[in-house]
Amino acid sequence: MNSFLQLKNISKHFNTRKKIKVLKNLSYNFDKGKMYALMGPSGSGKSTLLNLMSLIDRPSIGSIQFDKNIVNFDNNKKNDLFRAKNIGIVYQENNLLSDFTALENVYLANLSIDNDKEAASTKAKTLLKKIGLSNRLNHFPSQLSGGECQRVSIARAIINDPEIILADEPTGSLDLNTAKEIFQLLNNQKNPNRLIIFATHNRFFADKADCLLEMTNGSVKTINV
């Protein structure tokens, strides 16, 4: 099995009046071809861990490796490019650009690594049509339902064919039927060369993952594989 993402002795603390340790000496290997669910109460460190794995934030202690290459968190330019090419991110809340259409939100993600606007637009159109939004291409986020916004978010996350998809409560703000549709769309993105990790409070969706991880007190343990 190819352990593509390795976390080694990760700790993360935030300095306020009192040092708050969110993650504590956490180590775990994630394999390509699998979907992992992160469960745990609010404040257990799920979002913090996803931010570290997406290179949005850096650990206080420890290292992160992608395909055995250690991340240098001082090289922001390299990390930004790696994220754009290799990591797709889906958030719980609508994170779309409000002044851009659904189509523009998706193809702009492709333009971050390819300056061919026409090719990016064509690719985005094909992708949005494939996920059932052919009649919403020129709609702005405010004109879309919550489920439609999440479909656009997933399209934006996968347009560059990333090796990793990270999703933070992607169904959390949706009604159950819409949540099931969005989860199925996310699940459909699995392939042998891709790793998917999502955080959730919903055991129904967590149980559908290949591996369920429980986060408590800044650490993680495997519930099932």
Predicted regions and their residues:
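Helix-to-loop junction immediately C-terminal to a conserved catalytic motif
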Residues: 54
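Conserved ABC transporter NBD signature motif
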Residues: 62-73
